[in-house]
UniProtKB/Swiss-Prot annotation:
Record organism: Sulfurimonas denitrificans (strain ATCC 33889 / DSM 1251)
Protein name: Elongation factor G
Residue numbers binding GTP: 17-24, 81-85, 135-138
Keywords, comma-separated and alphabetical: Cytoplasm, Elongation factor, GTP-binding, Nucleotide-binding, Protein biosynthesis
UniProt xrefs under SUPFAM superfamilies: EF-G C-terminal domain-like (SSF54980), P-loop containing nucleoside triphosphate hydrolases (SSF52540), Ribosomal protein S5 domain 2-like (SSF54211), Translation proteins (SSF50447)
UniProt record, GO biological process: ribosome disassembly
Annotated family: Belongs to the TRAFAC class translation factor GTPase superfamily. Classic translation factor GTPase family. EF-G/EF-2 subfamily.
Boundaries of every tr-type G domain copy: 8-286
Function: Catalyzes the GTP-dependent ribosomal translocation step during translation elongation. During this step, the ribosome changes from the pre-translocational (PRE) to the post-translocational (POST) state as the newly formed A-site-bound peptidyl-tRNA and P-site-bound deacylated tRNA move to the P and E sites, respectively. Catalyzes the coordinated movement of the two tRNA molecules, the mRNA and conformational changes in the ribosome.
Domain of life: Bacteria
């Protein structure tokens, strides 16, 4: 079966936004206009196609990025819907990894929200070109130009309107296309916004349209590679429509500008013009920088994997989902070559052979079986045994490992227990499946209490996973109080000698090490240096020393929390010809490391959350007072659409139950968002409390 669309006619895009910007509605409309959807699904009544899990429909927020395929103007558009809630940034992160372009949806009233900043940062990290869609232009308080200003000041982006709105709020009629210099006005009819007509620009907006067209042309002519446009522009020559379109595309793909469009998905205006922009300005796989990787057998050998149909198969698994009917679905993005159903591939990340059962293309929840999937396409594979998120699947003939994704460590834990003994085994299986789908969700058993502990990125994240356990796996669970994931570190540098010697008839044990233990840079975790000269400790025992230190890192000296950011150098020691062995050196290192840490002024670290509260001015004092009581540090205060914005760093330990407290303190008029930011040392009095509680 040949390709349905040429590689250069494929667009892989994500639709990203904060909660309530109207992202799911926008995706629904796109599916409707591209002919995939017969009846428009509304989030308001919980029937949107992309929100395919029951809880998403109930909560009206999108949790998992469902992938779907549609067609517009002869181009194939693969859409990945990404969640807007901050507890699910991991989902956004993994979808950004496999996209070539993105549509950032902003609410014309709410503008740039804290979640938008997180998504924008991820977009920049992965170099994903974007188009902005300013949605909800029909709402009271809508202001297209305020959103443009916020993108510039708060996100440090370079927004360039390629359309401007005709009217706003109740009078929003359509947009002016600044490339063609025509007005596009939607009919007020029953055909769900399918009918619009092109007319001349209204006289009262002509001057504004000319001014914004000037700005647009100026922005694109400043970009490297568009010098010919700059020359024509400076000499006062008219640029042709094709030249402007090519200029906008080059500037967008080069991450120099972000074209802005406007509309209201709910009222079916502006979605077709957004699709036109996606097809015209976002890159095909062939127009993106090729993905880098390393060879499986030699991690130092960097290779470049271009997007092409020829060459050996290479793809990245970016999402795992459990489907009630077909079992495990592994979503992959193919970068090179093609893949046939029934064939064998190599998982180079795990060095395992996998058999491809079926290949399906998803349309939100409906699926279509296909025989083959090609470069640049996104699809789901059934029947993989070993593959998890972030693994590379490739051909046996060219074992390449594509760039790995980085996943954040969980910051919050709760104990879960099945309501009945009979559910114990079912719960174990359910949690294992959920953990396979979501790398930011961890499950372990507490050795002391025997309880099952689940950890994730926030209260909502864990709530939803417990809820899914109940719905999808029919396991009822009791959930304990949330626990904070503390860490431990040291503040001083120490040199520590430790000799482990055991003589007991027959063979003894002997290991002797000198370690320098010092605080590492933030975020480095555990770093080990071997500076043994002249074989005072034989080479084969060095890994045992490293292992002894690394394993001890998981159990700190103050309260048994994992340690981080510690730098260890092994610089001297001695051994015994007969009695030395790996175990002895491992124990010497472990005990020496522990003893050294006790002398190095150990400290407890806690996760600090970046919190943003939007609050009416009357309640501002109460909110700030409350944040201070929670050991918060207020970092900034500002205004947004008539409300006050308070930014602060607050310890996670103080944020449990905050939503209820904030609601009652402000009569439900304030909203907040929070995300993990960094670890910081806890004050002495808090540290003493934590140690007392942990050590009973």
């Amino acid at each position: 079966m040949a390709r349905s669309h040429k590689l250069e006619d494929v667009r892989n895009i994500g639709i990203a936004a904060h909660i309530d910007a109207g992202k799911t509605t926008t995706t629904e409309r796109i599916l409707f206009y591209t002919g995939r959807e017969h009846k428009i699904g509304e989030v308001h009544d919980g029937a949107a196609t992309m929100d395919w899990m029951e809880q998403e429909q109930e909560r009206g927020i999108t949790i998992t990025s469902a992938a779907t395929t549609c067609e517009w103007a002869g181009k194939q558009i693969n859409i990945i819907d990404t969640p807007g809630h901050v507890d699910f940034t991991i989902e956004v992160e993994r979808s950004m990894r496999v996209l070539d372009g993105a549509v950032s949806v902003f609410c014309a009233v709410g503008g740039v929200q804290p979640q938008s900043e997180t998504v924008w940062r991820q977009r920049n990290r992965y170099g994903v070109p974007s188009i902005v869609f300013v949605n909800k232009m029909d709402r009271t308080g809508a202001n297209f130009y305020a959103v443009e200003e916020q993108i510039r000041t708060r996100l440090k982006g370079n927004p360039v309107p390629i359309q401007i709105p005709i009217g706003e709020e109740d009078n929003f009629l359509g947009v002016i296309d600044l490339v063609k210099m025509k007005a596009i006005v939607w009919d007020v009819d029953a055909a769900m916004g399918s009918n619009y007509h092109v007319e001349e620009i209204p006289a009262n907006l002509l001057q504004k349209a000319q001014e914004y067209r000037e700005k647009m042309i100026e922005s694109i002519s400043e970009v490297d590679g568009n010098e010919h446009l700059a020359e024509k522009y400076l000499e006062g020559e008219e640029l042709s429509e094709d030249e402007i379109i090519a200029g906008i595309k080059a500037a967008t793909i080069g991450m120099h500008i972000v074209p802005m469009t406007a509309g209201t998905s709910f009222k079916n205006k502006g979605v077709q013009t957004l699709l036109d922009a996606v097809v015209a300005y976002l890159p095909a796989p062939t127009e993106c920088a090729p993905i880098k990787g390393t060879m499986m057998d030699d991690e130092d050998e960097e290779v470049i994997v271009p997007s092409t149909d020829s060459g050996e198969f290479a793809s990245l698994a970016f999402k795992i989902m459990t489907d009630p009917f077909v079992g495990t679905l592994t979503f992959i993005r193919v970068y090179r070559g093609s893949l046939e159903a029934g064939s064998f591939v190599h998982n180079s990340t795990k060095d395992k052979k996998e058999r491809i059962g079926r290949i399906v293309k998803m349309h939100a929840v409906k699926r279509e079986d296909i025989k083959e999937i090609y470069a640049g396409e996104i699809g789901a594979v059934v029947g993989l045994k070993y593959t998890t998120t972030g693994d590379t699947l490739c051909s046996e003939a060219d074992k390449v490992i594509l760039e790995r994704m980085t996943f954040p460590e969980p910051v919050i834990s709760v104990a879960v227990e099945p309501k009945t003994k009979a559910d114990q085994e079912k719960m174990g299986l359910a949690l294992a499946k959920l953990a396979a789908e979501d790398p930011s969700f961890k499950v372990h058993t507490d050795e002391e209490t025997g309880q099952t502990i689940i950890s994730g990125m926030g209260e909502l994240h864990l709530e939803i996973l417990v809820d899914r356990m109940k719905r999808e796996f029919k396991v009822e669970a009791e959930v304990g109080a949330p626990q904070v994931s503390y860490r431990e570190t040291i503040r001083d540098t120490v040199n520590q000698e430790y000799k482990y010697a055991k003589q007991s008839g027959g063979r003894g044990a002997f290991g002797h090490v000198y370690l320098t233990i010092k605080p590492g840079d933030a975020g480095t975790g555990f770093v080990f240096h071997n500076e043994i000269k002249g074989g005072v400790i034989p080479k084969e025992y060095i890994p045992a020393v490293e292992k002894g230190c690394a394993e001890t890192m998981s159990n700190g000296v103050l309260a048994g929390y994992p340690m981080e950011d510690i730098d260890i150098t092994l610089y001297d020691g001695s051994y015994h010809e007969v009695d030395s062995n790996e175990m002895a050196f491992k124990l010497a290192a472990s005990m020496g490391f522990k003893e050294g840490c006790r002398k190095a002024r150990p400290a407890i670290l806690e996760p600090l959350m970046k919190v943003e509260v939007e609050v009416p001015e009357d309640y501002m004092g109460d909110v700030i007072g409350d944040l201070n009581r929670r050991r918060g540090q207020v970092t900034n205060m500002g205004d947004r659409s008539g409300n006050k914005i308070v930014d602060a760093f607050v310890p996670l330990a103080e944020m449990f139950g905050y939503s209820t407290d904030l609601r009652s303190a402000t009569q439900g008029r304030a909203t907040y968002s929070m995300e993990f930011d960094h670890y910081e040392e806890v004050p002495k009095n808090v540290s003493e409390e934590i140690i007392k509680k942990r050590n009973g």
